[in-house]
Design a protein with these regions (language model features):
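Domain-level signal for soluble alpha/beta catalytic cores
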Residues: 1-305
């Protein structure tokens, strides 16, 4: 570890610009389909080498923070949306395996060049339906977070938050779990072009919902790609008391599954974000690749921030 590398991810987010990794599920879509699995998270148990290779590709591209392959690894989400009735033991194993694998990849990278990397444990976004038990959702969120923490993640990152009620539950779970394991929390929302959450609510409501978890960062992800993303980020920056993270998707795919935003688009976006001091970490979401992250990393490196 270099002397300039803080051991705490919260401190890193306060003092310099970090590079986040890019998409997971879209990058693993082919492997998921080939394995006849309903979602990419299950690759962590069935075909871990595919996930490990993706982590390494993002680290090689310059990512300082990589994400666990656990976007849907919540027992109630698996049951309600994928009709996959799984035991608590299986869900725990997915999250532990994902965390352990990502941590091992960062340790290997650090051993090679002495640079500290971090692992964000990705927490599923939730949207309770009328009649759902809030306590059941809270328990499911806590179970996922505890397994990620026990697997060694540095940060619990609840991403793609798209409704306020669900975000409040996730934040309550994080407020209970994070102090127990002495790890940090962060939240990222996907929002419409008008700045509202897809299921209703303003950014002010989001910030109110997550405050209970004392997050180390709050940001935006996915949205509709880098076009217009900086404008949304400016709005969040003016409202939020927390460091900001930024990782848009590569836009909406066409009928052939091709995403419109290329690595150069992400490099240009990163230049604007850095020039305006809009984010403490920059990366990519759906449709992005190691090439997109390499473009961001080059801009961050050249900026010296």
């Amino acid at each position: 570890m270099k002397p300039s590398d803080p051991d705490n991810i919260a401190e890193t987010l306060r003092i310099r610009t970090s590079v986040l990794d890019g998409a997971t599920a879209t990058m693993l879509a082919e492997a998921t389909a080939a394995a006849h699995l309903p979602l990419a998270d299950l690759l962590c148990l069935e075909h871990p080498k595919n996930v490990e290779a993706l982590h390494k590709a993002y680290l090689d591209a310059g990512a300082d923070i990589i994400s666990t392959n656990t976007f849907n690894a919540n027992a109630l989400i698996l049951e309600k949306f994928y009709h996959a009735k799984t035991s608590e033991h299986v869900v725990e194993n997915i999250n532990r395996a994902a965390a352990s694998m990502a941590c091992q990849c960062t340790r290997h990278a650090a051993a090679h060049d002495g640079h500290r990397r971090y692992v964000a444990g990705i927490v599923a976004p939730i949207c309770p339906k009328p009649g759902d038990s809030a306590e059941e959702w809270l328990d499911a969120c806590q179970a996922q977070m505890a397994a990620l923490a026990e697997g060694g993640v540095d940060l619990l990152l609840a991403e793609s938050c798209y409704n306020i009620a669900g975000t409040r539950i996730v934040a309550q779970a994080a407020a209970r779990i994070a102090p127990h394991y002495n790890i940090c929390t962060a939240f990222s929302a996907t929002i419409n072009d008008n700045g509202t959450l897809p299921m209703g609510g303003e950014l002010e409501d989001l910030l109110d919902a997550v405050a209970v978890a004392s997050p180390s960062a709050v940001g935006l992800n996915c949205c509709n790609g880098p076009q217009g993303f900086v404008r949304l980020l400016r709005k969040l920056k003016t409202l939020s008391p927390y460091p900001t993270i930024a990782y848009p998707g590569a836009g909406l795919p066409d009928s052939a599954g091709r995403y419109p935003a290329n690595p150069q688009d992400f490099g240009q976006m990163a230049r604007t974000i850095i020039a305006e001091d809009l984010a403490s970490a920059i990366g990519g979401c759906c449709g992005t690749t190691p090439a997109h992250i390499a473009a961001v990393a080059q801009v961050v490196h050249d900026s010296g921030k």
